Amino acid sequence: MFLDIDGVLNSNFWCENNQREISNGILIDKDKVKLLSTLVKTTSAKIILHSGWRFWFDSNLKSLRIEAEKLVDIFQREGLSIDGVTPDLTTEEIRLTKKFSLVKADEILLWISEHKDVQNWIVIDDLDLHNSEIEQHQIKTDNTIGLTVEDLENAKKMLLRK
């Protein structure tokens, strides 16, 4: 499971209630993490971060920032762990324009090509990733509400199909 964080485990709606910014790395909606935990436990999926949050971990998945430590702590409370991260294919131009969605699909497909044992996979992200193959595997969340029970059910079907 390729997991984005902002717009999935937090949302504009949730943050407006708390009058805080979602991208400051502090706000994770624990109810969304519980939904994610249900998905992982019922499908045995592994979590591969493909979010900008992946840059807050070293190559051994050790936290480099307090925000990453908080994410790991919240995950651990729900029995979750981060099992990997996608490679970084961003260019300087993409960094400057902040159009990271333009390379996310390539990063995911590269990760899959390097891990031949992957059977079923999904992408949970609030952004359009500009790739038809990814689109067939994507649970596209509404960034104003984040991960929902309906998203969870659709993800479960995708991961458990033969």
Task: Locate predicted features.
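Catalytic phosphate/metal-binding cores of nucleic-acid and nucleotide-processing enzymes, i.e., regions
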Residues: M1-K162
